[in-house]
Every structure is written in structure tokens, then in C-alpha cells.
Amino acid sequence: MKHLKRNIAIVCGGDSSEHDVSLRSAQGLYSFFDTERYNVYIVDIKGQDWHVELPGGITARIDRNDFSFVEDGKAKLFDYAYITIHGTPGENGLLQGYFDLIGLPYSTSGVLVEAMTFDKFVLNQYLRGYGVSVADSLLIRQGYEELVSDDEIEQRIGMPCFVKPAADGSSFGVSKVKNKDQLAPAIRKAMLESPEIMVEQFLEGTEISIGVYKTHDKSVVLPATEVVTANEFFDYDAKYNGQVQEITPARLSEDVTRRVREITSHIYDILHCNGIIRIDYIISKEGKISMLEVNTTPGMTPTSFIPQQVRAAGLEMKDVLTDIVENQF
């Protein structure tokens, strides 16, 4: 008897500044999935508008009671959700909690992991306890800005430094601050994106990004990508408007490559991650490896880091996605 195809929802959109980027990731994923094996649909969610795209340019409303929809007069349920939302609610645990409630398997880590990795300050403090090197930082909450003076920031963190939203899925609201006069406007800018912001030590070195995924029977750490930008830092403009050179595999020594791969696998296990994640690092001239960020819903356009790294590893995105989906069954 022929096995029925699983119905896969590529869940995209979301309520963050990166809504449109998420739609591009969804199109990339749609092109990568094995459609001989799966029925693949794109589900766009924004606020209260949840809908699935159907052939012929029509859409159908998603019933949030069970994440079903009606096609050709028949109710259809999904077997699996591949989440590619950058920011809320797909990268901070909210959507994961909903899928847990209705019993739908999904591609990302669970609620706790998503919530923790979304809050950069919390993540840094947690991983520091496991011996992972991270930049020094301090937290400022909206309404309590006066509790931390500019002089204290300069003394504790130093200049230059970064001011960024503590909980946000993008590079929006991030500023590189070179002197105390730039702190107040940078803090205001970051607080437009998040009520909690972090002031983070500037680390000089080579920036790299590396993907990893694990299943019941394999552990795959992908080749790293080196990020070279003419901008002050790897901001939104550099990330999405081509203001960056991406070198895969990164130009690293054998020793640094080995250590980065070991740390990446270790962080995946510490956090109890699921699916494919991407971790960003700064590597100093002396070879010190400092973790910058853990991205649990990495971009999936054909030119994004993960597809680049999969190609560099001699793998096919189709097979990687099949590994990730089937690991839940």
C-alpha cells in the first residue's frame, strides 16, 4: 500500500520587523522540500490573520483551534510545522507553546529554549555558567534608564560598545557606540524594538556563523561562513542588502575550526536544541572564540548562510530537511 504524503506547513510571517524576510525564507524552503515525499504549504501568520496559500493564488483561513484549513470543501490537518519566522511569535517560544498544546510536531527547539535564546542577555548569562566565552554586557530596562549612568557603562563595558534590543529576532535597533554622547540616542533607538536593551562589549576579530543539526542517528556541524562587511558591523543593511562578503568555508586554521565545531556541538547539547540552528562567533587574533548569538530559525533563502553551508558540505537541502522532519516521527 502506498504511504500517504505528510502535510507540511512552512509557517512564516510573524509580527516582527523581519516579516518580509521570513516570507523569503518560506519561498526558499518551499523550493528545497522534497515534494515527491511531502505535500508542502506556506502558512503566513500576522496578528490575527492566519492563512494558507493554495494553488491558483487563493488563500484559506487557518482554524486556530487545530491549525486546520478547508480545501475543496474538505478539512485538512497538518502533520508537521516547519517554523521560519524571524522574531515573535516563532522565535521566542509563543508559537511553540501553541503547537505543543494542539500536539503538532515542529522543526524548532521547545518553548524554554526558544524563549532563552531569543533573550540575548539571558542566553549570555546562562552559557557563561557552562564556560562558554561571551562578551561582557549589562541590561537596561525601559523606565529605569537613570539607574545606569553613562560613566558606569564606559567603566564596566568600555568604548566602543554595542547597544541592542535584548529580545529581538533581527539586527533592527542595533547601534555601535563610539563615545558617551552616542549612548542616549542608541538606547532610545533600541527601545523602539524591545523594552529591555543590552549594552555589550565590542569584541574585535573575525566574525563567523556556523550551522548545526542533530537527529537520533547523526550529528552534522556544517562548514562555517566568514562574514566580511564594509559596514560598522553586520547590521540589517549588510545582512539583506548585499553589503557583505560571505566566505564559505571560513578562512580559519585547523585548530580554530576544530574548536569552533566542538563548541557549536556543545552549545546545541547544553541548550537541548532541536532542528537546525546557527551560532555566530567572534574569533580574536589570539584565537579566542566568543559566542555572539544563537539563531534558532535561521534564514533559508537560497543565498542565506545555512543553504550556503549545506552546499559547501556536499549535502542537499532536500535531504537535510527530510532528516529534520522525519526525526520527529
Task: Describe every region a protein language model picked out.
Residues 178-262, 283-290:
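Phosphate-binding site of ATP-dependent enzymes
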Residues 151, 250, 270, 276, ...:
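Peripheral (often C-terminal) accessory segments that flank ATP-dependent C-N-forming ligase machineries
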Residues 2-12, 16, 24, 116-205, ...:
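Active-site nucleotide/adenylate-binding loops and adjacent lid/helix of ATP-dependent enzymes
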Residues 87, 227-230, 295-309:
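Glycine-rich phosphate/pyrophosphate-binding beta-alpha loops
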Residues 40, 105-106, 134, 161, ...:
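Hydrophobic beta-strand scaffold residues
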Residues 1-107, 111-112, 116-118, 122, ...:
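ATP-binding N-terminal substructure of ATP-dependent carboxylate-amine bond-forming enzymes
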Residues 201, 268-300, 310:
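Conserved metal-phosphate-binding beta-hairpin within the catalytic cores
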